[in-house]
Amino acid sequence: MQLMKSSYLELTARGHVTDLLKPDDTLEMLETYGFAVTQSPVEAVSTAHAYREIAAIREDFGLGEPYVPLLYRDRDEPTVTAVTRKGGSDHPVFHTGEAQGWHTDGLLEDIGTIKTTLLYCVSPAHRGGRTFLLNAGRVFEELRMEDPEAADVLLRDTILGRRSTIPGVDREAVGPVFLELGDGHYATRYGEGRVERWYPADAAEQHALDRALRFFRARRDDPDVRIDLLLRAGQCLIFRNDVLAHGRENFTDDPQRPRLLLRSLHTNAPKKPS
């Protein structure tokens, strides 16, 4: 990957949508920017067609079968999740139109477990529903240069707990916010939303943590390290969940055609099959 040197500002002129039938172009985008958006060649996309295209993407990039997160293992959840409004659901975000703060997928998983997320848009919202991506590792590297003490707190393996907000599910996973990888990049589980619980060891560490989080809040709206994507019908967002953080703005549905995205999670990183 080249994420530590990449700027999302480069995509203003270049664009970020690739042809579903040109996987080499898509893989180059993923290697450079950590994400890609494929465009279906089909004009009117059905849910059945979306599932077929997701299967083709999995095969093209060696992703393997979808991974079911630990949080949902006992809930009889499908391997590919329908992210849409649904009455009676106990999930605080999936089946509502509410915004979702910065996070990585895999609430209870060890850092870096879920490497790839696919989000396929069958039908967009009437208004809103953008997905945000943050080059979290690059921001962290900047923090290490500016305030090493604050950065070191985010590497501590008991600093961040992520706790389920699903009613009746009292589970939490504790770990670091960042983990150094061998290729000069960082795995991340950065987030600031409803599920995070912070565990600084003492007052000095609390001050360092506060500085680190302020740094991220100041940087995460910069289009150099953040990109906002509004998926259209037939587009599939592929991104490196282990190195990028993501979020979602709230949305309003067309009652006749509500927003529907299909989400597929994978423990493999995209690669060119041998």
From Swiss-Prot:
It is an enzyme of class 1 (oxidoreductase). InterPro entries: AlphaKG_dependent_hydroxylases, TauD-like_sf, TauD/TfdA-like. It catalyses: UMP + 2-oxoglutarate + O2 = uridine-5'-aldehyde + succinate + phosphate + CO2. Its cofactor is Fe(2+). One of its GO terms (biological process) is antibiotic biosynthetic process. It comes from the Bacteria. GO terms for molecular function: dioxygenase activity; metal ion binding. Keywords: Antibiotic biosynthesis, Dioxygenase, Iron, Metal-binding, Oxidoreductase. The keyword Membrane does not apply. Inhibited by several divalent cations, including Zn(2+). Its EC number is 1.14.11.49. Disulfide bonds: none annotated. Pfam families: TauD. Fe cation binds at residues 103, 105, 246. Pathway: Antibiotic biosynthesis. This is Uridine-5'-phosphate dioxygenase. It comes from Streptomyces sp.
